[in-house]
Amino acid sequence: MGSESLVHVFLVSFIGQGHVNPLLRLGKRLAAKGLLVTFCTAECVGKEMRKSNGITDEPKPVGDGFIRFEFFKDRWAEDEPMRQDLDLYLPQLELVGKEVIPEMIKKNAEQGRPVSCLINNPFIPWVCDVAESLGLPSAMLWVQSAACLAAYYHYYHGLVPFPSESDMFCDVQIPSMPLLKYDEVPSFLYPTSPYPFLRRAILGQYGNLEKPFCILMDTFQELESEIIEYMARLCPIKAVGPLFKNPKAQNAVRGDFMEADDSIIGWLDTKPKSSVVYISFGSVVYLKQEQVDEIAHGLLSSGVSFIWVMKPPHPDSGFELLVLPEGFLEKAGDRGKVVQWSPQEKILEHPSTACFVTHCGWNSTMESLTSGMPVVAFPQWGDQVTDAKYLVDEFKVGVRMCRGEAEDRVIPRDEVEKCLLEATSGSKAAEMKQNALKWKAAAEAAFSEGGSSDRNLQAFVDEVRRISASLNSKSSAVGYVKSKINGVVEYVDSKLNGKAAPVEEANTRTNGIAKVEQPKAANGKVEIAELTPINGKVEIAELKPINGKVELVES
């Protein structure tokens, strides 16, 4: 079956690496279930995705379906530094996106790939408005935990007290969740947060939350059962994670902006089981130079082997390039590797990896849990502080190295060493590993055929197919043709008494196909005479309602 014959969903992503990865993973899951998926984002990161992952213009087969890519220009210069300022960039992305996405949808329809559903991720809620304007359904992929979805929901609607200028240290009790201390609440909700633009960007989706017919989440029922069941009474959520595990798309295209250093796997192969600490703080967290120095000295003192990912900052970010202490690599020798970007999924699944020192972003959290990997929690801001609370206190797979930006301190080398040793040896490490393997088994059961997430995703796919069939039946309900002129039934431009003139008749036809061109309207209405099929086919070029009406009448 060719890709053009499949039900088509159109995914629109914000440009952040932490947004692209889960939405692309969802796209591959949907394709594996037999859909045609188009993944779309701005060209400024599209060019990096093409370069790092070998993306081409051809649809790529994934399971029973296909995935393809389209990128659009945001109309800013390639090196425009304002992309780093969300208060400036998000309005620009919305302005351009609301114009170009409908054009892309129309072009796909003209090329035989009509779109049946749009799906977006946070920061670009206007995609739901675009879908609504086109008469298409929309869905949204939430890229944080169900607990954070609930926290933002209750904050936005003022349902429970949160830290405020009058009560900075207010703990937060949300139904079906453990008590969150003030510094365990998503930090963008702090009244003193230095990132108010991120609060605005995230909460923007909540103003549009009634428009998507489904909110998909990269989590699974068994992991967050109580809060998922509670939130399901407030909004149409479906847990479909972990998305990064896809048995039908093991070698499918990735969305990394930098090419991963796969040679590191060969080095890992030479190390003993559970002996290597993996350190990565994601795609947007940049530490102070002083903190990097303390982590480096703590690593050397602990004696553990390690892989440390040190991603260089974006040239326009304003961050300085971090450097390692003098002589660090020489002292570490063959027991340490420092890389710019890594194949994280492969490292976390490798038997030589002992634990993951992580910023606790949700993508990394899901990858560690699904890989059965204990963690050392090093959250900085946003949902990371909430995820760290769950990893350590609820899922019991981690030790906490810091509490995030509210703590506002550099973690000294002796504490770094203590946490590394606690996570890699002794009874605490064994207990964490046992719990991590339990969550790995639960995650694998969830995404396996017939598991909770697989059932939820299949239900979503079935609903998209049902909607697609309904859309197709409406578009084909314009009528049937009796009259033929040179094998083509045509509407004429002339009007009689303010109505479109009747169709001329002829006795010939071509290929047994009747074609209906766009009729002209009079008095704000389009009136269509009775049409009958020829050899069971009627092809309609385009019918546009005038004043919101298309009327069918029998002749």
From Swiss-Prot:
GO biological process, one term: response to toxic substance
EC number: 2.4.1.177
Record field: pH dependence: Optimum pH is 8-8.5.
Key words of the record: Detoxification, Glycosyltransferase, Transferase
Tissue specificity of this protein: Highest expression detected in fruit, with lower levels detected in flower and petiole. Barely detectable in leaf and root.
Keyword Transmembrane: no
Binding site for UDP-alpha-D-glucose: 344, 359, 362-364, 367, 383-384
Top-level lineage group: Eukaryota
Residues annotated as catalytic: 19 (proton acceptor)
Comment on activity versus temperature: Optimum temperature is 21 degrees Celsius.
PROSITE patterns xrefs: UDPGT (PS00375)
Gene Ontology MF, one: cinnamate beta-D-glucosyltransferase activity
Recorded catalytic activity of this chain's protein: (E)-cinnamate + UDP-alpha-D-glucose = 1-O-(trans-cinnamoyl)-beta-D-glucose + UDP
Family statement: Belongs to the UDP-glycosyltransferase family.
Function summary: Broad spectrum multifunctional glucosyltransferase. Catalyzes the formation of cinnamic acid and p-coumaric acid glucose esters during fruit ripening. Accepted substrates range from derivatives of cinnamic acid and benzoic acid to heterocyclic and aliphatic compounds, resulting in the formation of O- and S-glucose esters and O-glucosides. May also be involved in detoxification of xenobiotics.
Protein name from the UniProt record: Cinnamate beta-D-glucosyltransferase
Annotated source species: Fragaria ananassa
